[in-house]
């Protein structure tokens, strides 16, 4: 296919995006003529399901070997660029001395082996939620592929989720929020599942309606927290409680490499699992425009102090209610005020480690359970009925 022979990968991306925008997600996309392993991760991430190509044989006929990072010629090799069952008993010199047909057959089997291996790698990456990390890695194989990748990051991060239909559909199709750590890199913040998570926070999160004393939130200030490590409920909660004791009208927000994370979403995957080296925090914030800020730098571990103070008990209860209501807002699409009202008088059941595993309403009915593996929420049947009775609308799938 001339498009790919000429390395016009940016045009290829635009074609797939245009196709994906119009074809229903349940319909498979068959990409004819795409047979280079280097392109598989990107095309699969964009929505391609099937590939049809004789590239493995055509490249072998010209003495070229396919690899996940590009193409190499047999004439240039002293060692094989990648291990394979097909070529392990031969040296490049021995293969060059073979007859045309024997050499072509051998290289074709090698190319087909590498092609199948890369497809298997992509399938496994989908299962583990690391496909976009693989796309980013492969994008460094050529300038043209890198250009195409950067265009993708611009498309999926443009505007809000509700306005960016193409980006939204790509995210919905390829990046469910899942547990597991994310290694930070230059373009990690453009991975769909991180864009999805930040987009939900930007569009749905707002401060709780009341502080822990029961007073309405009136121009609260941000408590920006830096220096802690996940899980933040262990490393910074003691500092958060002491700060709230001094000033109930503040909202704790964690400063991360990926941006700012409200403390009431501190255990929500994937944002709670980002791995990165230490960094200088960005003191700006778009969570609450114009809000006053207080900066709290946590040095090392900050374990919560043992205390029988009733205020501390009230703060802990408020933090739990704030966390559940924030997740109802961000994950279920509820208004924060309605979620807060719904949870009035809630009681909880804890795991052996002290984390909340079941939430009961004021009447003692089990309404939801926080998922300890990814920080999400699972509604019970009773909880879903109660949610519907609040006229909060149907929960959105995220």
Say what each PLM segment does.
Residues 1, 29, 51, 301-306, ...:
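Hydrophobic residues within beta-strands of alpha/beta enzymes
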Residues 49-55, 349-351, 367:
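Short hydrophobic/aromatic-enriched beta-strand-loop microsegments
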